[in-house]
Regions:
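Extracytoplasmic ligand-binding site segments that recognize negatively charged/polar headgroups
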Residues: 40-54, 66-82, 86-227
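Conserved C-terminal helix/tail region of periplasmic/extracytoplasmic solute-binding proteins
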Residues: 320-357
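Periplasmic-binding protein-like
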Residues: 137, 201-206, 212-213, 245-271
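Immediate post-signal peptide segment of exported/extracytoplasmic ligand-binding proteins
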Residues: 22-40, 58-59, 163-169
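A short alpha-helix/helix-coil micro-patch that ends at or immediately precedes a cysteine
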Residues: 53-61
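A ligand-binding cleft/hinge motif common to bilobed small-molecule-binding domains
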Residues: 97-101, 224, 229-248
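Mature extracytoplasmic/periplasmic domains
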Residues: 259, 263-326
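Short, low-complexity disordered leader/linker segments with a strong preference
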Residues: 1-36, 352-357
Length: 357
């Protein structure tokens, strides 16, 4: 009787998923995942979206789903320390530079996902199946217009403007020790300026930085209240703050050009619940998962063909394709070295602002 009930439940779930628009998932995978019974998700997207996705996955498949919100740098440090015996099963959200470093270190498991066929482009997946993209975010500036007016300052329009002495102590960005966003910023400047000029740039920029935040979204959360006057980060985080009531925030795409993140999901090598992890990847690549972001006030551009883009983003006029031709291979191969070079360039300026707990 129990066996019959389990088979009926699997069949019902497959039928339900097909009705929702999810691609047909192997019944054997669903059954194996349910037998494992649990899944542990480390999420580097914003927590409301992470919580919504974990809850929905649990409701769909009857698999107890635990989650913890950590920055990409924190996840990377954790799985590096665990060295093939991870306490988590999957990674969800956050920019791909730390994913690539982790894959290179043998800490991610390759998996060929069926639902990857619905990705808008092959650029939104790792060629070997170590990670898959779920959203895209544009890098830029968020500024407090009231504070700039009070100080008698114009808003910066490009990367080089951030070096002006009048912005000393007004700029926040994230910490390369803990945030994938900061690694993307470093890679972006290397690709725009060349390696040596980029390192010189960061030495000058550091003179104007008041704080390096643990999370990439950290600056955006302090712009509206004026604690941060100029924040470097993803513009969708700024949109979330504007829509929450901070109409004193303006969004700026740097005039010299900018890059973008691909927010990803992946399986940890050596995870305990491997089948549940594979099922999560299939789920994460569905419109039913990625469209939860809109209701959770995460306004990234979605990279799933059949997914509906968040309507709240349209009035801001952001073009997801108005970005540089970001060299993902260079970032994949050299991010670790570039971060080391960043700290070496700063020298004694790499002070307590970069400390991690």
């Amino acid at each position: 009787m129990k066996k019959l009930f389990a088979l009926l439940l699997c069949a019902l779930l497959v039928f339900s998923c097909a009705g929702l628009g999810l691609a047909e998932i192997d019944e054997a995978l669903i059954k194996a995942a349910q037998e494992e019974g649990e899944l542990v998700v480390y999420g580097s997207c914003e927590e409301p979206y992470l919580a919504a996705a974990a809850k929905h996955f649990e409701e769909l498949y009857g698999i107890k789903t635990y989650y913890q919100r950590l920055s990409t740098g924190e996840v990377q440090a954790k799985i590096t320390e665990e060295n093939g015996n991870p306490s988590g099963d999957v990674w969800f959200g956050g920019t791909t530079d730390p994913y690539n470093e982790s894959a290179k270190a043998g800490l991610l498991m390759a998996y060929e996902a069926k639902n990857a066929a619905d990705l808008a482009s092959d650029m939104y997946r790792d060629a070997d199946g170590y990670w898959y993209g779920i959203y895209k975010g544009i890098l830029g500036f968020m500024v407090n217009t009231e504070e700039l007016e009070r100080l008698g300052l114009e808003a910066p329009q490009g990367w080089d403007d951030l070096l002006k002495p009048e912005y000393q102590g007004l700029i926040w960005m994230s910490n390369p020790n803990t945030a994938g966003t900061a690694k993307l910023i470093i890679n972006t400047m290397v690709q725009l300026k060349g390696h040596d000029e980029a390192m010189k740039y960061f030495v000058e920029l550091d003179k104007n930085i008041a704080q390096y935040t643990k999370s990439g979204s950290g600056p955006s959360k302090k712009v509206g209240i004026g604690e941060c006057v100029i924040g470097i980060g993803f513009l969708h985080d700024g949109i979330a703050q504007i829509l929450s009531g901070y109409d004193n925030i303006a969004l700026i795409i740097p005039s010299e050009g900018t890059s973008f993140e691909i927010g990803a999901t992946a399986i940890f090598e050596g995870c305990v619940h491997e089948n549940a992890a594979k099922l999560w990847i299939e789920y994460a690549l569905s419109p039913e998962c990625v469209e939860l972001a809109d209701d959770a006030e995460s306004y990234q551009f979605l990279v799933i063909n059949s997914a509906q883009q968040p309507a709240a983003v349209e009035p801001f006029g952001l073009d997801p394709n108005n970005v540089i031709d970001y060299d993902f291979e260079d970032a994949k191969n050299n991010t670790t070295q570039y971060v080391t070079d960043f700290f070496n360039a700063l020298g004694d300026a790499a002070d307590s602002r970069f400390k991690t707990e």
